[in-house]
Protein backbone atom coordinates (compact mmCIF):
# COMPACT_ATOMS: atom_id res chain seq x y z
CA UNK A 1 0.00 0.00 0.00
CA UNK A 2 1.35 3.43 -0.92
CA UNK A 3 2.38 5.58 2.03
CA UNK A 4 0.34 8.78 2.25
CA UNK A 5 2.57 11.81 2.00
CA UNK A 6 2.99 13.95 5.13
CA UNK A 7 2.23 17.41 3.75
CA UNK A 8 2.17 19.65 6.79
CA UNK A 9 5.46 18.72 8.50
CA UNK A 10 8.84 19.13 6.81
CA UNK A 11 11.53 16.53 7.41
CA UNK A 12 15.08 17.67 8.14
CA UNK A 13 17.79 15.08 7.57
CA UNK A 14 20.62 15.83 10.00
CA UNK A 15 23.93 15.22 8.24
CA UNK A 16 26.30 17.61 10.00
CA UNK A 17 27.94 15.09 12.32
CA UNK A 18 31.61 14.33 12.65
CA UNK A 19 31.67 10.56 11.85
CA UNK A 20 34.56 10.27 14.31
CA UNK A 21 33.88 6.61 15.12
CA UNK A 22 33.35 5.53 11.51
CA UNK A 23 36.84 4.29 10.67
CA UNK A 24 38.15 2.24 7.75
CA UNK A 25 41.85 1.27 7.71
CA UNK A 26 42.49 3.65 10.62
CA UNK A 27 41.07 6.60 8.67
CA UNK A 28 37.83 8.40 9.71
CA UNK A 29 35.34 8.27 6.83
CA UNK A 30 32.34 10.50 6.16
CA UNK A 31 29.61 7.90 6.49
CA UNK A 32 27.17 10.10 4.55
CA UNK A 33 29.11 9.10 1.43
CA UNK A 34 29.09 5.34 2.04
CA UNK A 35 27.03 3.44 -0.58
CA UNK A 36 23.81 1.77 0.55
CA UNK A 37 21.66 -0.66 -1.41
CA UNK A 38 21.58 0.55 -5.02
CA UNK A 39 22.36 4.14 -4.04
CA UNK A 40 25.81 5.74 -4.32
CA UNK A 41 25.58 7.16 -0.80
CA UNK A 42 23.77 6.87 2.51
CA UNK A 43 22.80 10.51 2.02
CA UNK A 44 21.04 9.81 -1.27
CA UNK A 45 19.41 6.66 0.11
CA UNK A 46 17.92 8.51 3.08
CA UNK A 47 16.87 11.56 1.07
CA UNK A 48 15.18 9.49 -1.66
CA UNK A 49 13.49 7.21 0.84
CA UNK A 50 12.12 10.01 3.01
CA UNK A 51 10.71 11.84 -0.01
CA UNK A 52 8.30 8.93 -0.35
CA UNK A 53 6.80 9.86 3.01
CA UNK A 54 7.33 13.63 3.33
CA UNK A 55 6.40 16.28 0.79
CA UNK A 56 9.43 18.33 1.89
CA UNK A 57 12.83 16.91 2.88
CA UNK A 58 15.78 19.21 3.58
CA UNK A 59 19.36 18.20 4.38
CA UNK A 60 21.10 19.96 7.28
CA UNK A 61 24.87 19.79 6.84
CA UNK A 62 28.12 21.70 7.16
CA UNK A 63 28.36 21.90 3.37
CA UNK A 64 26.39 21.03 0.25
CA UNK A 65 27.02 17.66 -1.37
CA UNK A 66 26.81 16.59 -5.01
CA UNK A 67 23.29 15.32 -4.40
CA UNK A 68 20.80 17.78 -5.90
CA UNK A 69 18.62 18.58 -2.88
CA UNK A 70 17.66 21.54 -0.68
CA UNK A 71 20.24 22.19 2.04
CA UNK A 72 20.32 24.05 5.33
CA UNK A 73 23.96 24.90 5.94
CA UNK A 74 25.22 24.92 9.52
CA UNK A 75 27.49 27.93 9.97
CA UNK A 76 29.31 26.66 13.07
CA UNK A 77 32.24 25.14 11.21
CA UNK A 78 34.33 23.82 14.09
CA UNK A 79 31.48 22.86 16.42
CA UNK A 80 29.55 19.62 16.04
CA UNK A 81 26.12 19.40 17.67
CA UNK A 82 22.74 18.54 16.15
CA UNK A 83 21.36 21.47 18.15
CA UNK A 84 22.84 23.87 15.59
CA UNK A 85 20.99 22.15 12.76
CA UNK A 86 17.75 22.03 14.73
CA UNK A 87 17.99 25.71 15.67
CA UNK A 88 18.85 26.74 12.12
CA UNK A 89 15.95 24.70 10.72
CA UNK A 90 13.36 26.45 12.87
CA UNK A 91 14.75 29.90 12.10
CA UNK A 92 14.85 29.20 8.37
CA UNK A 93 11.70 27.16 7.76
CA UNK A 94 9.39 29.18 10.05
CA UNK A 95 7.05 26.25 10.58
CA UNK A 96 5.41 25.02 13.82
CA UNK A 97 6.57 21.41 13.57
CA UNK A 98 9.65 19.76 12.08
CA UNK A 99 10.51 16.07 12.01
CA UNK A 100 14.23 15.47 12.51
CA UNK A 101 16.09 12.28 11.69
CA UNK A 102 19.80 11.54 11.76
CA UNK A 103 21.37 10.45 8.50
CA UNK A 104 22.84 7.35 10.13
CA UNK A 105 19.49 5.77 11.07
CA UNK A 106 18.38 4.32 7.71
CA UNK A 107 16.22 1.45 9.03
CA UNK A 108 13.48 3.41 10.80
CA UNK A 109 10.12 2.31 9.43
CA UNK A 110 7.63 4.70 7.88
CA UNK A 111 5.07 3.37 10.32
CA UNK A 112 7.17 4.49 13.29
CA UNK A 113 7.76 7.91 11.73
CA UNK A 114 4.02 8.36 11.15
CA UNK A 115 3.30 7.50 14.79
CA UNK A 116 5.79 10.14 15.98
CA UNK A 117 4.37 12.76 13.62
CA UNK A 118 0.86 12.07 14.86
CA UNK A 119 1.54 13.18 18.45
CA UNK A 120 1.52 16.96 18.45
CA UNK A 121 0.97 18.23 21.99
CA UNK A 122 4.59 18.27 23.18
CA UNK A 123 7.69 20.34 22.42
CA UNK A 124 9.59 17.15 21.54
CA UNK A 125 8.28 13.67 20.75
CA UNK A 126 11.10 11.16 20.39
CA UNK A 127 11.52 7.45 19.77
CA UNK A 128 12.61 5.00 22.46
CA UNK A 129 13.63 1.44 21.68
CA UNK A 130 14.01 -1.26 24.38
CA UNK A 131 17.57 -0.18 25.23
CA UNK A 132 17.97 3.46 24.22
CA UNK A 133 16.40 6.87 23.70
CA UNK A 134 16.66 8.18 20.15
CA UNK A 135 16.52 11.96 20.43
CA UNK A 136 17.37 12.44 16.75
CA UNK A 137 14.36 10.49 15.54
CA UNK A 138 11.87 13.02 16.75
CA UNK A 139 9.14 15.56 16.12
CA UNK A 140 9.88 19.07 17.44
CA UNK A 141 7.61 22.06 17.98
CA UNK A 142 8.72 25.67 17.77
CA UNK A 143 7.83 26.17 21.46
CA UNK A 144 11.27 24.70 22.20
CA UNK A 145 13.03 27.73 20.67
CA UNK A 146 13.50 29.77 23.86
CA UNK A 147 15.06 26.82 25.67
CA UNK A 148 17.13 26.01 22.58
CA UNK A 149 18.42 29.58 22.38
CA UNK A 150 19.44 29.43 26.04
CA UNK A 151 21.14 26.06 25.55
CA UNK A 152 23.25 27.40 22.69
CA UNK A 153 24.03 30.61 24.55
CA UNK A 154 25.31 28.69 27.58
CA UNK A 155 27.10 26.16 25.33
CA UNK A 156 25.46 23.16 26.94
CA UNK A 157 25.26 20.96 23.87
CA UNK A 158 23.83 17.90 25.63
CA UNK A 159 20.70 17.04 23.70
CA UNK A 160 19.35 14.95 26.57
CA UNK A 161 19.49 17.90 28.99
CA UNK A 162 17.44 20.09 26.68
CA UNK A 163 14.83 17.44 25.97
CA UNK A 164 14.44 16.16 29.53
CA UNK A 165 13.84 19.74 30.76
CA UNK A 166 11.32 20.47 28.01
CA UNK A 167 7.74 19.35 27.50
CA UNK A 168 8.74 16.05 25.93
CA UNK A 169 7.57 12.47 25.71
CA UNK A 170 9.12 9.20 24.61
CA UNK A 171 7.20 6.86 22.33
CA UNK A 172 8.17 3.26 22.98
CA UNK A 173 8.86 0.90 20.10
CA UNK A 174 9.53 -2.82 20.49
CA UNK A 175 12.02 -3.42 17.68
CA UNK A 176 15.60 -2.47 18.48
CA UNK A 177 16.79 -3.29 14.98
CA UNK A 178 15.03 -0.47 13.16
CA UNK A 179 16.76 2.12 15.35
CA UNK A 180 20.26 0.89 14.56
CA UNK A 181 22.64 3.84 14.44
CA UNK A 182 25.52 3.53 11.99
CA UNK A 183 28.25 4.82 14.28
CA UNK A 184 30.87 2.32 13.15
CA UNK A 185 31.81 0.22 10.14
CA UNK A 186 30.42 -2.82 11.96
CA UNK A 187 27.04 -1.09 12.36
CA UNK A 188 27.08 -0.19 8.67
CA UNK A 189 27.81 -3.77 7.64
CA UNK A 190 24.93 -4.99 9.81
CA UNK A 191 22.55 -2.48 8.18
CA UNK A 192 23.66 -3.61 4.72
CA UNK A 193 22.88 -7.21 5.70
CA UNK A 194 19.47 -6.31 7.16
CA UNK A 195 18.49 -4.38 4.03
CA UNK A 196 19.68 -7.26 1.85
CA UNK A 197 17.49 -9.68 3.80
CA UNK A 198 14.59 -7.25 3.44
CA UNK A 199 15.08 -7.17 -0.32
CA UNK A 200 14.87 -10.95 -0.32
CA UNK A 201 11.45 -10.69 1.30
CA UNK A 202 12.32 -12.23 4.65
CA UNK A 203 11.61 -9.13 6.74
CA UNK A 204 11.38 -5.32 6.83
CA UNK A 205 8.47 -5.16 4.39
CA UNK A 206 7.67 -1.52 5.11
CA UNK A 207 11.16 -0.17 5.65
CA UNK A 208 12.93 -0.18 2.34
CA UNK A 209 12.34 2.18 -0.58
Swiss-Prot record:
GO biological process, alphabetically ordered: bis(molybdopterin guanine dinucleotide)molybdenum biosynthetic process
GO molecular function: GTP binding; metal ion binding; molybdenum cofactor guanylyltransferase activity
CDD domains associated with the record: MobA
EC code(s) of this entry: 2.7.7.77
Subcellular location: Cytoplasm
Catalysed reactions, as listed in the record: Mo-molybdopterin + GTP + H(+) = Mo-molybdopterin guanine dinucleotide + diphosphate
Family: Belongs to the MobA family.
Matches recorded under NCBIfam families: PRK00560.1
Subunit structure: Monomer.
Protein's UniProt name: Molybdenum cofactor guanylyltransferase
Species for this entry: Helicobacter pylori (strain J99 / ATCC 700824)
Gene assigned in the entry: mobA
Amino acid sequence: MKNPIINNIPCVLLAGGKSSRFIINNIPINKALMPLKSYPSLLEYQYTRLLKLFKQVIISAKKSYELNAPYLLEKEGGLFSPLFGIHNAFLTLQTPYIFFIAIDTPLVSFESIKILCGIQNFSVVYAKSPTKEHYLISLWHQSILNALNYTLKTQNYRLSDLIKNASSTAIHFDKEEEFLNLNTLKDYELAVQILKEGSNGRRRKDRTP
